[in-house]
Amino acid sequence: MTTAIIGVGNIGKSVARHLVNGGERVVLAARDESNATALANELGELASTTSVEKAITDADVVVFAVWFDTLKDLLAQHADLLRGKVVVDPSNPVAQDANGGVVRTLPDGQSSGSVVAGLLPSGAHFVKAFGTLGAESLASEANRTPRAVLFYATDDD
């Protein structure tokens, strides 16, 4: 199985490291190709880099580890490629404000998961995961005892 990780910030790096440590193949794509290349070099032979389009095409699972607004844009651009794929969304409906803080980008009562699910094509398998843990916890708490709890949700059986 191959997992594409789109975005190699804190969440993308953590997910990629854990997958490779578990023996899984990852394909990395990022806005700044040099960041993806550096991570692939660190991770070794189970990691490679390519374009977003090729990463999605070649993968069984696609993790979009990007800001929510970027995720919406990527889904609009690549929706047809996502049919039959497992799409993992760790995003939260926030954006950076002018002061370096974060602000909610959706009205109260509307979730990022429901928005993303509505943007996916028929045949995509949506999983909402990793958004309840900060990147630091995701990086440090996996594969430890006692085990951390990671919530996820999907409509698939």
Model-derived regions: residue spans:
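NAD(P)+-binding Rossmann beta1-loop-alpha1 motif at the extreme N-terminus of oxidoreductases
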Residues: 1-45
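Rossmann-like NAD(P)-binding element
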Residues: 44-47, 52-100
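General beta-strand structural signal in soluble alpha/beta enzymes
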Residues: 49, 88, 125-131
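Short, conserved loop/helix-junction motifs that constitute active-site signature segments
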Residues: 78-84, 119-121, 144-145
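Conserved catalytic-site region of short-chain dehydrogenase/reductase
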Residues: 96, 133-137
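Short beta-strand and adjoining strand-loop segment in the mid-core
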Residues: 101-109, 141-157
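Rossmann-fold dehydrogenase core element
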Residues: 106-130
